Amino acid sequence: MTDIQEKLKNYISSELEYWDFSGVIRIVKDSTILYETSRGFASIEFGIQNTMETRFEAASVSKQFTAFAIMLLYDKGLLCLDEKANQYLPDSMQIPADITVHQLLCHTSGPHNNYNFEDDFYVGADRMPYDREQFFRDWILKDAGNLSKKKTRNSFNYNNSNYNLLAWIIETVSGQTYSEFMEEHIFSKLGMTQTAIDDGQRILRNKANNYMHDYGVLVRVPYTNSLYSIGAGALVTNCDDLQKWYECLRTKNLLSERAYQIFLSENTNHYCYGLEWYARNSYLHGGDFLGVSAYTHYFFDENLCILLLSNTESLDQYRLGTGIAAILHNGQAPHYYRPEEHLLAPQDLAKYTGTYLPGKIQIEEKNGKLYLVRVNQNIHIELYCVGKDSFIRRYEEQQTPHRLIPDGGGQPSIWGYKRIREPL
């Protein structure tokens, strides 16, 4: 074992044990695996452990594949990136006329973001049977009047809706379903036999279940219909296939040189097409969803990549990935420790409890512990005090505490929402 491998092993092992990680990590240099590990369970119910062959949901790591598919259509002369997106969408699914395909790809188009606190989409409407046109009408086109009034579309606003629309462009232009196109033109050509688009129904063998902490105990995440993540998420894959994908990008396979130049060019806010330009001329994209953490970091000039897939949200994959990259480049990778707990009596916790956004955000006290109630009232996330009016999650890494009462006092608030009702 080389010195670098020993450092990677020691650092990653200490991090994963401290944060109770469940998933897989692989680091590849010059097509050789420098380090890999699998931890935790793919199925807690049946005692099935994760292995390096386990398949995981990849959340927003999916976006780089959608963007690549658009570039395949570009290479075939089937679409122009600077043309209006409406030219490639069905007549019944038209968006404000000035939005281009390029703006969708780099998140500067400005459609409605349905993953917000106020809307009833997240763990609400996205649990229903998938209807493409209804989804478009009710959740993508929402606030279209305000959207049409925008004079410029140069500001960055990361939004899954952009990539939902791109998936529908792929379907319209190709005449195939999004899943069929990805399978025929990307997955099968690269031998990615363990990669698929999850339609929420077909059985994907060796796929890990996703878990979250509810009242401090790991539970299955609430059901959502993965088709509502089309283009923006829904990819299921494993480390072997992601390594094949990295090699495709590194060797510039499947696309023309010109298409790769566009695909990897930095736009607003360091965003390319489905990837972010990062330090050392590298490209990165992660993903987060209910019980899902994913991370891909590519150093093409050095023939180096970092891959992480997890079926819990216990650890900050971006911090860990940055630490791994630091070791690979002879730097220091600091360990992040949970801040010391400041014990509070139940009566002291009570001043934070109540409703902050009806049906969406609530804080409750139970058996001397404070819980943030989220995910449509399904998940109770334990918080503990780390300073005056400051709290963090106990079981998931969180580096910036929730400041529940602002400096100078006032009404309790979280994420900008003031408490509107105290508990009865």
Q: Each predicted region: which residue ranges?
A:
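Secretory-pathway/luminal and periplasmic proteins that interact with or process carbohydrate-rich
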Residues: 34-35, 92-100, 110-117, 189-199, ...
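Non-catalytic beta-strand/loop surface segments
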Residues: 203-204, 208, 212
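Short, well-structured active-site flanking segments
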Residues: 34, 65, 71-90, 173-201, ...
